[in-house]
Amino acid sequence: MDPFVVLVLCLSCLLLLSIWRQSSGRGKLPPGPTPLPVIGNILQIDIKDVSKSLTNLSKIYGPVFTLYFGLERMVVLHGYEVVKEALIDLGEEFSGRGHFPLAERANRGFGIVFSNGKRWKEIRRFSLMTLRNFGMGKRSIEDRVQEEARCLVEELRKTKASPCDPTFILGCAPCNVICSIIFQKRFDYKDQQFLNLMEKLNENIRIVSTPWIQICNNFPTIIDYFPGTHNKLLKNLAFMESDILEKVKEHQESMDINNPRDFIDCFLIKMEKEKQNQQSEFTIENLVITAADLLGAGTETTSTTLRYALLLLLKHPEVTAKVQEEIERVIGRNRSPCMQDRGHMPYTDAVVHEVQRYIDLIPTSLPHAVTCDVKFRNYLIPKGTTILTSLTSVLHDNKEFPNPEMFDPRHFLDEGGNFKKSNYFMPFSAGKRICVGEGLARMELFLFLTFILQNFNLKSLIDPKDLDTTPVVNGFASVPPFYQLCFIPV
């Protein structure tokens, strides 16, 4: 058959498939802009700032609406009420993970971030239990974070109060905490193996944040037939998995079943207990991918939040002064901060919360999916439909947070200066898919920041009023603009 005829037939089939998918069930789905064949609503979305586009569309179609990214149908949730109703009140029905062709290629359905069903539930339950087990290797997770915080302070001392970009050092600290939990080992910041790991993690975040990856996920045929950065992403992930597998083999040879040292040991012990169960989800494949998931999810998000926190503290020296006064009063100079201190430091706690609220790190979270046909607000959402959640619409709700575009710790303080919780605080998402490392991340943010401010004054290279804190939105995360500062020993 003539190649031209084959091409026309293929394009015609794709067009018909697109029209059929977009028209099927439209009477039951939430409203939304009319999609174009094949490309859907992509032309109506700013790929570099999806969150802003969703906010604009919500003003037209309401808090629940339908979009098509290519052939992929998505239902968008915008605003606290619908997000709570879906992710919390109907948590089980909305607990699936959205379709990610690239991740599915890399992870093969294993791990904790992109798995679904029984596998996801069992691996998540085990990971939560293990991360909360403060007795691994007779050292609590808090001990590990405190140790890394001391190392971080010593690295900052080496800058000798000269101007520096904190990106690298602030990236090393949370990565080392995860390494300590998974591998029972922290690395020197100049260790070549550690630097290679950091390089792969950072490069992957840069790649994932590009519009090209959005295109690959919406048109998965590209993955096999086109060159691009997605190939580098898959190569980096394969490198990390190979490295983790080597460490798993080392653990198998040296493990003491009665004295687990780290996450890998705990997983291997669980595998041993379930070795007679042919349906067990505790396999080497799941261990390797879960460890890679924890490394990827637990490094860049925390380091970016820390980097943004220091920029905001530079911009608002009056806030920094209040935090340091609270540190001096509650902790002093002669001991290290600990998590028990947080309950006695409402202002510092409010500042950490406000940093996370203000920066809105992951504006749309990772997409969910419905696990069955769901009736939601008089609409029928078919099983498997991807759910896109606007966390921006919750964290920047102007009824809950007056002047949401302003950095103001009073958003989390009552009139008496006591810490005030808010149900709208969802930087880790909400419901059954809430970030498994939430507790660890909150511990790291509090301890790293208090250790830094206990030991250093922060000095800006320019007038604080002239510092730009506008986030650089890159399609996946909101990151701070480049800046330098000086760490002046107190």
From Swiss-Prot:
Q: Which GO terms describe its biological process?
A: epoxygenase P450 pathway; long-chain fatty acid metabolic process; monoterpenoid metabolic process; omega-hydroxylase P450 pathway; organic acid metabolic process; steroid metabolic process; xenobiotic catabolic process; xenobiotic metabolic process
Resulting phenotype, residue 150 to H? In allele CYP2C19*11
Question: What's the impact of mutating residue 329 to H?
Answer: In allele CYP2C19*18
Q: Name the chain's protein.
A: Cytochrome P450 2C19
Its annotated function is as follows: A cytochrome P450 monooxygenase involved in the metabolism of polyunsaturated fatty acids (PUFA). Mechanistically, uses molecular oxygen inserting one oxygen atom into a substrate, and reducing the second into a water molecule, with two electrons provided by NADPH via cytochrome P450 reductase (NADPH--hemoprotein reductase). Catalyzes the hydroxylation of carbon-hydrogen bonds. Hydroxylates PUFA specifically at the omega-1 position. Catalyzes the epoxidation of double bonds of PUFA. Also metabolizes plant monoterpenes such as limonene.
Q: Does the keyword Metal-binding apply?
A: yes
Membrane topology designation? Peripheral membrane protein
Which GO cellular component terms, listed alphabetically, does the Swiss-Prot or TrEMBL entry include? cytoplasm; endoplasmic reticulum membrane; intracellular membrane-bounded organelle; plasma membrane
What does induction of this protein depend on?
A: P450 can be induced to high levels in liver and other tissues by various foreign compounds, including drugs, pesticides, and carcinogens.
- Identify the CDD domains for this entry: CYP2C-like
Substituting residue 51 to G results in: In allele CYP2C19*19
Which pathway does this polypeptide act in? Lipid metabolism; fatty acid metabolism; Terpene metabolism; (4R)-limonene degradation
Q: Which cofactor does it need?
A: heme
Which residue positions does the secretion signal occupy? Answer: none
User: Origin, by domain of life?
Assistant: Eukaryota
Phenotypic consequence of residue 331 to V:
In allele CYP2C19*1B, allele CYP2C19*1C, allele CYP2C19*2A, allele CYP2C19*2B, allele CYP2C19*2C, allele CYP2C19*2E, allele CYP2C19*2F, allele CYP2C19*2G, allele CYP2C19*2H, allele CYP2C19*2J, allele CYP2C19*3A, allele CYP2C19*3B, allele CYP2C19*3C, allele CYP2C19*4A, allele CYP2C19*4B, allele CYP2C19*6, allele CYP2C19*9, allele CYP2C19*10, allele CYP2C19*11, allele CYP2C19*12, allele CYP2C19*13, allele CYP2C19*14, allele CYP2C19*15, allele CYP2C19*18, allele CYP2C19*19, allele CYP2C19*22, allele CYP2C19*23, allele CYP2C19*24, allele CYP2C19*25, allele CYP2C19*26, allele CYP2C19*27, allele CYP2C19*28, allele CYP2C19*29, allele CYP2C19*31, allele CYP2C19*32, allele CYP2C19*33 and allele CYP2C19*35
The places in or outside the cell where this protein is found are: Endoplasmic reticulum membrane; Microsome membrane
Enumerate the UniProt keywords alphabetically.
Answer: Endoplasmic reticulum, Fatty acid metabolism, Heme, Iron, Lipid metabolism, Membrane, Metal-binding, Microsome, Monooxygenase, NADP, Oxidoreductase
Matching InterPro entries, A to Z? Cyt_P450, Cyt_P450_CS, Cyt_P450_E_grp-I, Cyt_P450_sf, Cytochrome_P450_fam2
- A GO molecular-function term, please? oxygen binding
User: Taking the first listed entry, what is the main subcellular location of this protein, grouped into a coarse class?
Assistant: endoplasmic reticulum
Q: EC number(s) per UniProt? A: 1.14.14.1, 1.14.14.53, 1.14.14.51, 1.14.14.52
Residues annotated as binding heme are 435
